[in-house]
Amino acid sequence: MQRWANTLSYCGFNIMEPLPSYWTYDRFLKKMDNAALKEIMAAQVKKLYEMGIVDASFIGLDSTPVMANTKQNNPKSDPDCALGVHSASNQHNERRYEFYWGYKSHVLVDCISGLPLYELTTPGNIADSFVAAEILAAANQTVSLKGCTFLADKGYDVKSIYNTVKTVYEGEAFIPLNPRGTKDLKALSAGNPVCEAGLAMHKDGKTADNGRTRQKYCCPFRQSKASVCPCNHKNWNNGKKNRGCTKYKTVPDDYRLSIDRSCLCFKRTYALRTECERYNSRFKSTGQERLWVRNGTSAVNLNTLAHISALAVALAAVLHGSHSYRSAKQLRRSA
């Protein structure tokens, strides 16, 4: 910091005196009320919104891991961190995971300008979908999200998020399906699944549970007098009137399953979500990928300050008529 005398002066430091010590910054981060920092960030977002720089038409929500300042096999030095898992890929056919001790920085980003609208830091064991509704509600207090287009990865593929975007904010959700717990059933063109013996199964009514409707399919020979199953299924000789295997298919009767994810409109709109990845990359470049503090309060405040800095760069660039509102290097040069 000693190299940037003008910047220090703008920040209120006396360049003729020594800078505050490490422990002074450490105490500041530990005692600072995060609500005050959130108010500063909200004021910046409002200012940029009034200037037409940020917009809530296309918003993306994503999280990025923040490693705690502790050993991976002994996290006792930071009692507030938690064990989290980070997926190295969004492809459903790739299972590359990384476990870590630390936190998550959840950021709602304007996918047009690439600037943050709201942020929330949680321990690493909190699921992304668990805090989505809270983040949207908080961001809506600063900038209206009515009629927004919400973009997120498959980690947010939860029915409640779709319903919140649709009913509360009157928007549209562009989220790929998460194939968790699903089976790739072989089916005919008519939609009837094929059993293990290669025979088309018959419809056998519908069932409703857990807020979903499922179509039941049964064995075509369930009431047959034959003593042998074509594939020797374990349920054939069950001693019951109806024999053989059964399968279920979820009937797309809700908003989540009614979205056509194969159309060109969905693919082009969802491509805007890459702005979230770009912002997370800029966030990590500020040194937040691994913390130097060792408590939850300091971690939360440090992350919020990093997002405030990104918005400050944008504000300074816009007020000075520059288009480089994403570059911290350009801001330092202008200072």
Labelled PLM ranges:
Residues 130, 181-190:
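Short, charged, surface-exposed secondary-structure boundary motifs
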